[in-house]
């Protein structure tokens, strides 16, 4: 009974934080599906990553807030006060997730497990022989609470995003990947530094204070 009471208190506290969250309110006002859009927005505004005409691959895309943000950046006219982007899409956005995603106008969505070769082949087919300008990875595993197992799962997903970027991204392109502080963090930073000419670590203001997430941004591939 005590555990149930504790759990309900935790759930109520989370719900209270969520309802009163500035970014949750802003997302509703501006028509984004999740507050995560503002994490990418800050990273983009800091580094100037997203430009019209690009090919952007969004890994771990559901519910679609990052794809929505990219979609708006690739329109000749951006919507104000919420709603969808205005005007034709100038660029290509391919989103992928193991979970379903409600359509985002102009975005190609593939549902499947990025770890499976046939899903990767579908993604390559949608790229039509082009290399990506930008790869986004908001992929995160289901965490077990066992540090060593969770670290391995996190590291595996980021390694897959790194491998994809090395093989399918322009040399001058960029990779944005979500990582978590813990046993996998330092090895992943090392891998990024081995792979990219410049590496930035950003914890956006929209990341919750209690969250251990950080985003690694790799700019420009080193020859391999």
Swiss-Prot record:
Pfam families: FtsJ (PF01728). Signal peptide: none annotated. It comes from the Bacteria. Its main location: cytoplasm. GO terms for molecular function: rRNA (uridine-2'-O-)-methyltransferase activity. The keyword S-adenosyl-L-methionine applies. It is found in: Cytoplasm. Its EC number is 2.1.1.166. The keyword Ubl conjugation does not apply. InterPro entries: RNA_methyltr_RlmE, RNA_MeTrfase_FtsJ_dom, rRNA-MeTfrase_E, SAM-dependent_MTases_sf. One of its GO terms (cellular component) is cytoplasm. Specifically methylates the uridine in position 2552 of 23S rRNA at the 2'-O position of the ribose in the fully assembled 50S ribosomal subunit. Belongs to the class I-like SAM-binding methyltransferase superfamily. RNA methyltransferase RlmE family. This is Ribosomal RNA large subunit methyltransferase E. It comes from Albidiferax ferrireducens (strain ATCC BAA-621 / DSM 15236 / T118).
């Amino acid at each position: 009974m005590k555990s149930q009471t504790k759990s309900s208190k935790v759930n109520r506290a989370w719900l209270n934080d969520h309802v009163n969250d500035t970014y949750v309110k802003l997302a509703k006002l501006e028509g984004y599906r999740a507050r995560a859009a503002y994490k990418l927005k800050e990273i983009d505004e800091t580094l100037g990553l997203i430009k019209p005409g690009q090919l952007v691959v969004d890994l771990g895309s559901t519910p679609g807030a990052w794809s929505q943000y990219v979609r708006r950046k690739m329109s000749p006219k951006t919507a104000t006060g919420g709603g969808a982007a205005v005007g034709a899409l100038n660029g290509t956005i391919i989103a992928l997730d193991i979970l379903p995603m409600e359509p985002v106008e102009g975005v190609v969505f593939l549902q499947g497990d990025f770890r499976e070769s046939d899903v990767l082949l579908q993604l390559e087919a949608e790229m039509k022989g082009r290399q990506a300008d930008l790869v986004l990875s908001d992929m995160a595993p289901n965490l077990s609470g066992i540090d060593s197992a969770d670290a391995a799962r996190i590291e595996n997903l980021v390694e897959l995003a790194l491998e994809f970027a090395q093989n399918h991204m322009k040399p001058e392109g960029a990779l944005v990947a979500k990582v978590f502080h813990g046993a996998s963090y330092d090895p992943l930073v090392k891998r990024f530094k081995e792979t990219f000419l410049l590496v930035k670590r950003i914890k956006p203001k929209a990341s919750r204070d209690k969250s251990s997430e950080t985003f690694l941004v790799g700019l420009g591939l080193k020859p391999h």
